[in-house]
Amino acid sequence: MLTMRNLATVLLLVVGAGASAAAESPRFTGSPSCATSMCHGGAGELRHQTTIWQKQDIHSRTYNTLVNARSAQIAAALKIPDAATSSRCTTCHAPFHDVPKAAFLAEITKPAEGVSCESCHGPAEKWIRSHTRPDFSHRDRVLLGLRDLNHLYVRANSCVACHQTVEPALLAAGHPELLFELDGQAVSQPKHWREKGDWHGPKAWLVGQAVALREMSAQLAQEKTPGEKLTAPWAASLWLLQKLDGLDSALPALKSAANASQAHPAADTLARRAAELEWSHDLTRQALQRLAKTHTEFADAKIPRLQQARRAERLVLALDRLTAPLDKPALAKLEPDLKELFALAQSLPDFAPEKFAKSLESLTKKL
């Protein structure tokens, strides 16, 4: 479930950019075309992707969410006959349900398979036969329709539409709030891929946060009477990224973004430039120190407690990803404070800013 604004974005990602007509666009071949034993459905590290997706990856079971009791309650509150067939739900939980039949190479549409291969990698008609050929470069495959998930900006955009914003009506009906975190969520996934580049870590975290702020800004700018569930997370996200203004001369500052309309393009520029940035351990260290020093703000009783709580939930995830690259002895030294910070940030109604400030100050002294 997502905002109606992002529904079109998700469909574009699924069907393929520039798809003006199904006949001219690459078509879907279906996950079975990827799952033969000689391809991604076999055994061993090079051929076990389908097995991992089917048995370990929650994306293969996203459709199941639509047929449980909670979804039935949400659908009833929204006066939707069936969550399993409504595009307000299937766009993210069963993407192929909303794709026209003409976009398929054969009768393979299986909404119940959830988020499958081509949902992320793009329609495979034009590249499936050539993507293993040694004389075809990665660029060649991308030109044929393979989504360039090696690029962090592209990767973030492929995920954020279904992992960040939810329309207010859905939230009011009981849909949980979403918080997009590209690096942490990617690391927590059962890996069906091999990595050779800088695709995880602080750089991925920053790109993901900038893309998340862009999406929240776009949603907020469209709402005539946005409630706290939209404004508070947006303000916390903007606050977090503003702490990194000036981290590198190639990155734009967000200090002047006074509202959602201004933050939207600024956040997108930040995401694009961060994805191209040559990241370093020094940048990680600087970002970590800047965010840790916000303990003085959490000690400020003039800042509303709920505002502090929203900041804290974003901050602890940032600290988690920025400390992940540290060596084991350094990370072990910080672990008690990190655990306490996470525990303190868990409950919005009971958030205690003064305790959070003390724990954050303790962590700051150990950096």
Task: Please state what every model-predicted region is.
Residues M1-L7:
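Positively charged n-region of N-terminal signal peptides that target proteins for export
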Residues C34-T36, C89, C117, C159:
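Short cysteine-rich clusters marking metal-coordination/redox-active sites
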Residues E24-M38:
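Local sequence-structure signature of Cys/Sec-based thiol-disulfide redox active-site neighborhoods
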Residues A69-K101:
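Long, well-ordered hydrophobic secondary-structure segments characteristic of membrane-embedded
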Residues K328-L367:
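Charge-dense, extended regions
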Residues A8-G18:
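Bacterial N-terminal signal peptides
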Residues A43-A77, K101-V115, P123-E313, P349, ...:
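Primarily the internal scaffold of c-type cytochrome electron-transfer domains
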Residues P304-D337:
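Long, charged low-complexity terminal regions
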